[in-house]
Amino acid sequence: MYKRQRSLTALLERTPADKAIVVFGARQTGKTTLLEHLFQDRKVKWLSGDEPQDRELLTSLSSKADISILLSGLDVLVIDEAQRIQGIGMLLKRLEDSKPSCLIFATGSSSLELAGGVMESAAGRLWPMTLFPLSVSELADHNSWLDVMESLPIRLTVGSYPEIVTHPQRSKATLRYLFESIVFKDLFAIAGIRRSEQFLHLVRLLAANIGNPCSFSSLGQQCGLSSPTVERCVSLLEQSFIVKTLPCYCLLYTSDA
């Protein structure tokens, strides 16, 4: 945690003072924990998109006076799980425009584009950062390099989410919980994904083809979805940090590439 806190502190020092900072990252990568450590000696107000009363408070800020009251006396305002708040993009813009000297932070366990074009709504007001699971160098901070190399096959299989690293015996259950949380809380609820059986079939097909070339049309034929629908689903999965797409290797880019 110390190394991550030190890295984020260095990033904050280079961040423009007139930007709200959005920390993206998959669920359980330590976004909230990191900010708690970073601002433990500051006056911070925490709000969460998972809490109905917090969502109601944020969506009811109808004037600059309301925003001034909310930010009064604060060093930092943190909005956790911001993608669940309706109109979060415009809200962040208004908060940033109205703040006196308060730092504005938002965290999102899926790309905030899922909430309706946040980056477009708050163009010029946001400074995005992405927090990934633990890196090899971070693991080596707390273990010997020999231990890290011996655990490499496991890391390549189940990943390096902090919960999985600290409780390896629960890795399968943790991954299942994270996947279901992302699918049912973010993709189905926020992005409006329907035809859940076909969607889950698509996810299984993608998992079975890791490292292999895939075409949207072929995947669509196998799971009963149209090619444009498959393309949208894959894009949403990537925004939610479930998959990572890699374009085909090409030496010569042309207009047809």
What do the predicted segments below correspond to?
Residues S109-S111, G116-A208, N212:
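Interdomain motor-coupling "hinge/lid" segment immediately C-terminal to the ATP-binding subdomain
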Residues K31:
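Conserved lysine of the Walker
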Residues L103-S109:
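Structural recognition of the conserved hydrophobic beta-strand(s) that form the central parallel beta-sheet
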Residues W46-S72:
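Short glycine-rich substrate-engagement loop in P-loop NTPases that contacts/grips substrate
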Residues L34:
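Hydrophobic positions on the alpha1 helix immediately C-terminal to the Walker A/P-loop
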Residues K3-R14:
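Pre-Walker A adenine-sensing motif
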Residues R176-S255:
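Accessory nucleic acid-recognition modules appended to NTPase machines
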Residues M1-Q5, Y253-A257:
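Conserved small/polar residues in nucleotide/adenosyl-binding loops
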